[in-house]
Amino acid sequence: MIIGNGGIAKSFESSKLDHKLLCIIAAGHSDSTVNDAHSFRREVNMIKRVHKNHTNSKTIYFSTTSKYLSATQTAYIKHKISMETLIASCSTRYTIINLPNVICSLNKNNQLIPWLYHSLQSGKQIDINPEARRYIVSSDEIPLCVEKIANKDYKQVALMPQTALKMYELIEIMEKITSKKFNVNYSNFTEYYQKIFEPKQYDFVYEVNGSRKNIERILTKLIRTYE
């Protein structure tokens, strides 16, 4: 069973994954800027309801690698950690899959890639630390990760690229694809997302290709389809 209708949930539509014995919760918050107690409570209630109605299924929940990579514990990160605790208290049959920045769609929201794309299209000035790093994966990798770990007893899994891209590289990639220039102010302001990924913090790491060439390929396909 798949719960949700967003980008992550839709990534399972073309997947061959047999999820009849799984309860894949893909309906949580993906906007790391959110700080809404009401919507946080709604997710708590949803998870409790799911566990009550699907006691025989293994739960797959998507959290964030930012809980270890971020130097600042935002409301969003604290909420994700509390959701992990809730799931662990409801069942012993679960896996938390921690995600970095996910390329799902270009629909307007506060996620990194859509924010960059629409800032580029509008000419809005953005402030960027060029040396800041971002770990980026495609949503197409998520069903493959779930298939890999579905029958394992891992509690904490990370879906991570082998390398991180610097922000100036992302800027260059999107400018190349669109033949447009960002209105960007490069500055060395303090970045809250500077820590290096540590595999030992997880039971299993599902590694994907995060090279500049591969991210350019994924973004080219996404942008061409959107436009």
Predicted regions and their residues:
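Structural signature of the Rossmann-like NAD(P)-dependent dehydrogenase/reductase core
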Residues: 25, 58-63, 95-98, 158-159
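NAD(P)H-binding glycine-rich loop region in Rossmannoid oxidoreductase-like domains
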Residues: 14-56, 64-72
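Mid/C-terminal beta-alpha module of Rossmann-like enzyme folds, strongest
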Residues: 145, 151-199, 216-227
